Every structure is written in structure tokens, then in C-alpha cells.
A protein has these predicted regions:
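Transmembrane alpha-helices and adjacent helix-loop boundaries
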Residues: 1-220
Length: 220
């Protein structure tokens, strides 16, 4: 017999795990996109050293496991005198990881804008800033929005990795509950359902945002 009711007393811990998972996901996405924007600009820069450095960063991060990157930040940095809490180390590692993927997504968006479109904007008397905002930025965001939405969901699922360093997100909470109740099936089934609700909820939210911002605006 399954005993899901026995997990009710841990609802507070589960809620805290959900909140930390969401917090890590949102802050990581913001920081990662900021890093990614800088790297994407470097990748498309006419200055070769910048392009080389940016490419090395992207290739190094995208071709090594997130868990290894996390361990370098949490266990490696203390050896040079930099000691971080589990949550801070998780945020830094996830942001660095997201930065590499975000850079490639943003670069693809910028490169999807043809030079003729920019030239047309300038010929209409738009300033460089207005051209970037109206001719480059909005179409680029529209082109990469689905990829960014999917990347957010992937980052949210990837937060489960940070339980390996003791960050008390959702998966770590599940391990704690399992160790107290020995109800492994019930615990991980509940956590699986929690992740499913979160991911489907955010996918629906992103789809609604896309419709209101891009589809509805164009129809007007």
C-alpha cells in the first residue's frame, strides 16, 4: 500500500525546495543571459582575440559536464582561498553554464538579422540605437524566444544537480524526506509530479507571453 499521506508533514520543506528551485532558475537565467550577451557580442566582434576567448569559453563549458563545473566552483575554489556557500556556488556554476548556451542562442538570433534590414533602418533616418532596438533586437528576440524558453526549463531541471553539494532545492529535499520516512517511491513520485507541474506551467506561461508579445502585436 502506498502512503502518500505520510508525506504531508513535510509540506513545508517541499515548498521551500520548490521556492529555491525557482529562485535558482530565475536568477540563473538573468545572470546567464547577461553573460551570454557579452560573450555573443565578443563572438561576433571584429577583434579576433575577443572572438577566440569567447569561443574557448563556450566550447569549454558546453563540452564538460555541469556537475564537474559545479564541483570546481564549490570544492576547487576553497583551495585558492575562495569559500562559497552551497547556494552561492550553485548559482555561480549554473550562471556560467547558462552563459555559454545563452551566448550561442543570442548569437544565432543576431546573425538571423540580415545586413540589408539594418541598412534599411538607417536609410529611414533611425539612429544606431533605434535601429538596434527596432530592427535588430525585437526580431532577434522573436527568433530565439522558443529556444530561450526551452533553455529556462532545462536550467530548472538542471538545478537537481546542485543537491550533490548540499543546496536544499527540490531534489535535495526529496533525499531528506526519503531518509526520514523510507518511502522512496512515494517521495520521488511526488517530486517527479512537482517538476512536471513546474515545467508544464512555465511552458504554458511562455507560450502565452509569446502570443501576447509577438503574435498579437503583429496582428495589430
Amino acid at each position: 500500500n502506498f502512503r502518500f499521506g505520510a508525506l504531508w508533514r513535510f509540506r513545508g520543506q517541499i515548498l521551500e525546495g520548490v521556492l529555491l528551485t525557482l529562485q535558482l532558475s530565475v536568477v540563473t537565467m538573468i545572470c546567464g543571459l547577461a553573460i551570454g550577451l557579452v560573450v555573443a557580442m565578443a563572438r561576433t566582434s571584429p577583434i579576433q582575440p575577443l572572438r577566440v576567448i569567447a569561443r574557448i569559453y563556450v566550447e569549454a563549458i558546453r563540452n564538460t559536464p555541469l556537475l564537474v563545473q559545479l564541483f570546481i566552483v564549490f570544492f576547487g575554489l576553497p583551495s585558492i582561498g575562495i569559500k562559497l556557500s552551497a547556494n552561492t556556488a550553485a548559482l555561480i556554476a549554473l550562471s556560467i553554464n547558462m552563459g555559454a548556451y545563452g551566448a550561442e542562442i543570442l548569437r544565432a538570433g543576431f546573425e538571423s538579422i540580415r545586413t540589408s534590414q539594418v541598412e534599411a533602418g538607417r536609410s529611414l533616418g533611425l539612429t544606431a540605437g533605434q535601429t538596434f532596438r527596432h530592427v535588430v533586437l525585437f526580431p532577434a528576440i522573436k527568433a530565439i524566444y522558443p529556444a530561450l524558453a526551452s533553455q529556462f526549463v532545462l536550467i530548472m531541471l538542471a538545478t537537481s544537480v546542485v543537491s550533490s553539494i548540499g543546496a536544499t532545492e527540490l531534489f535535495n529535499t526529496a533525499a531528506f524526506i526519503d531518509s526520514r520516512t523510507y518511502l522512496s517511491f512515494e517521495t520521488y513520485a511526488l517530486i517527479t509530479a512537482s517538476y512536471l507541474v513546474l515545467t508544464l506551467g512555465f511552458r504554458a506561461l511562455f507560450a502565452a507571453i509569446y502570443w501576447f508579445v509577438f503574435v498579437r502585436r503583429v496582428r495589430r
